[in-house]
Design a protein with these regions (language model features):
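Electrostatic interaction modules used in gene-expression and signaling proteins
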Residues: 1-126
Length: 126
């Protein structure tokens, strides 16, 4: 149990939980759900963890989850808010979102800026 509490403290610190939970536009109950899912995953005793249909070594998943910060969490919560499609297995969806956030967030925002600057169907200058 001490291991879980140690990870909880580390994760809450990594994501700046206190500041994030008081931010306007942040649904605290959803934030708390994400935190618990991160802790459950990081504390898993499995050797492999399935994410988006692929098995990943638990150490790799743990490492990536421990690198999550407030920006990643805000990104995930914002994308969830924008989602209009039915999600059949929310746990699997959130695990994939958490795992992929550190490697997709910058590309998402770059594409969004490109769309805002040049509009749909407009080619960027070379």
């Amino acid at each position: 149990m001490r291991r879980r509490e140690t990870y909880r403290e580390l994760i809450l610190d990594n994501i700046c939980y206190d500041a994030l939970s008081q931010s306007s536009g942040i649904d605290k109950s959803r934030l708390d759900e994400l935190v618990e899912l991160i802790i459950d995953t990081v504390c898993s005793k499995r050797e492999m963890i399935r994410i988006a249909g692929d098995d990943h070594p638990a150490d790799v998943v743990r490492s990536r989850f421990l690198k999550l910060n407030a920006e990643h969490i805000e990104y995930i919560l914002d994308r969830m808010e924008e989602n209009t499609t039915q999600i059949r297995n929310i746990k699997k969806y959130l695990l994939a979102a958490l795992y992929n956030a550190p490697v997709t967030m910058d590309s998402y925002y770059s594409a969004l800026v490109g769309h805002d600057l040049y509009g749909p169907g407009t080619r960027r200058p070379q």
